[in-house]
Curated annotation (Swiss-Prot):
Its EC number is 7.2.4.2. The keyword Translocase applies. This is Oxaloacetate decarboxylase beta chain 2. It is a multi-pass membrane protein. It catalyses: oxaloacetate + 2 Na(+)(in) + H(+) = pyruvate + 2 Na(+)(out) + CO2. Signal peptide: none annotated. Catalyzes the decarboxylation of oxaloacetate coupled to Na(+) translocation. NCBIfam families: Na_pump_decarbB, PRK15475.1, PRK15476.1, PRK15477.1. One of its GO terms (biological process) is sodium ion transport. Heterotrimer of an alpha, a beta and a gamma subunit. Its main location: membrane.
């Protein structure tokens, strides 16, 4: 009988909590969205599967060595950790002390847990290498740069303003998060508000990079919101675009784009990086990798490297990035009131960014002979190339011969640049406070 009891106690099912059960269902929902609905499957599938692995009871795949120690509830070991942190020897007090501790102290406690015989789970290791170091989002940005054509932006530089205007959604969302905190509805710190705001840029790698730096405890919810709403761009944007434009404006035909020379395409990423990085060094990592990837593409002398970055490398890193995000889909971090706030603010951010881009296009038309179709302003959010396709689709509904795709790629690419710069602004000023 004792053997049977020991066998049952060894089963993960016997230790399944309500929170873990809910998160398993959330993970299955993400898998269903990725497979059945094809919502950003390249990221949502590994994120969903990482969520499944993270919530298997007793497996500890997403736990660091220190988290494994705290989950073990050994009184002697808890006393040692508590003495180092000068707090009461219970799990809750230790977690509160760790949250307030400096990163160097947290690393010391992690090393102490390793010395006591605990090891981090495989997903925790993935997270430390891929996101904790910031490497994975940067490599993906390099791949995105290698797949990006700056031609439409260079052919019509005014569209850079549309991409810049769409970033208004980012900063409006930061204010929204702080407003919720001010009125006591949902508690958000300034770093958390900044990390949530970047969802408005519709740029998954940037959202993961910034939240990993500013609010790693919210990374799972922010990443899920960012990629889910990116997949929903065809549903979110058209009503806003139609509400802000007239039938006549939607029928505006833009002049043919000029041919951009190879020299311009080679010089642009170099000049862009130097201008932005010299003024805002904190934007250099993201923008630097993006421009490097684009330079490999446009130079034409490293085709093997460009092909590797666009295909093999970005695919491999995407797998580990998704699983690493899944490591944050654990019940005690995801099932919080903050998650609802993130989901709400995320969709508002998309809406504001879309509206700002459209309104900027209308403003430019007031002082320009060559009119811009306001629909391409919505492509200023950096969901590449989905936002540009939505602009083209809505335009074709009003005029079946009005093809806006290449025109919309200009603000779409500008949006990628804008979101990287916005992330640099957040890092510089939020971390300085």
């Amino acid at each position: 009988m004792e053997s049977l009891n020991a066998l049952l106690q060894g089963m993960g099912l016997m230790h399944l909590g309500a929170g873990q059960a809910i998160m398993l269902l959330v993970s299955l929902l993400l898998l269903w969205l990725a497979i059945a609905k094809k919502f950003e499957p390249l990221l949502l599938l590994p994120i969903g599967f990482g969520g499944l692995l993270s919530n298997i009871p007793e497996a500890g795949l997403a736990l660091t060595a220190l988290e494994s120690l705290l989950a073990h509830h050994d009184a002697g070991q808890l006393a040692v950790i508590a003495a180092k942190l000068h707090c009461a020897p219970d799990v809750h007090a230790i977690k509160e002390a760790l949250a307030l501790a400096l990163p160097s102290v947290q690393n010391q406690m992690e090393n102490l847990a390793v010395d006591m015989g605990y090891t981090p789970g495989v997903l925790a290791l993935f997270y430390k290498v891929a996101i904790g170091s910031g490497v994975a989002p940067l490599v993906i940005f390099m791949g995105v740069g290698a797949m990006t054509d700056f031609g439409p932006l260079l052919a019509n530089p005014r569209t850079l303003l549309l991409g810049a205007a769409a970033q208004f959604g980012i900063f409006a969302t930061v204010l929204g998060a702080l407003t919720l905190n001010y009125f006591g509805l949902i508690s958000f710190t300034l770093p958390q508000a900044a990390a949530i705001g970047i969802i408005g840029g519709a740029d998954g790698p940037t959202a993961i990079y910034l939240s990993g730096k500013l609010a790693p405890e919210l990374l799972g919810a922010i990443a899920v919101a960012a990629y889910s709403y990116m997949a929903l761009v065809p549903l979110i944007q058209p009503p806003i675009m139609k509400a802000l434009t007239s039938e006549t404006e939607r029928k505006i035909r833009m002049v043919q784009l000029r041919t951009v020379s190879k020299r311009e395409k080679i010089l642009f990423p170099v000049v862009l990086l130097m201008l932005v990085a010299l003024l805002l060094p904190d934007a250099a990592p993201l923008l630097g990798m993006f421009c490097f990837g684009n330079l490999m593409r446009e130079s034409g002398v490293v085709e093997r490297l460009s092909d590797t970055v666009q295909n093999g490398l970005i695919n491999i890193v995407t797998i580990f990035l998704g699983l690493s995000v899944g490591a944050k889909l654990v019940a005690d971090k995801f099932l919080q009131p903050q998650t609802l706030g993130i989901l709400l603010l995320g969709v508002i951010a998309f809406g504001i960014g879309t509206a700002a881009g459209v309104l900027m296009a209308k403003l430019l038309n007031l002082c320009s002979k060559n009119k811009i179709n306001p629909l391409i302003g919505s492509a200023g959010v950096s969901a590449v190339p989905m936002a540009a396709r939505v602009s083209n689709k809505v335009g074709l509904e009003s005029d079946a011969q009005n093809f806006l795709l290449m025109h919309a790629m200009g603000p779409n690419v500008a949006g990628v640049i804008g979101s990287a710069i916005a992330a640099g602004v957040m890092l510089k000023y939020v971390l300085a406070m």
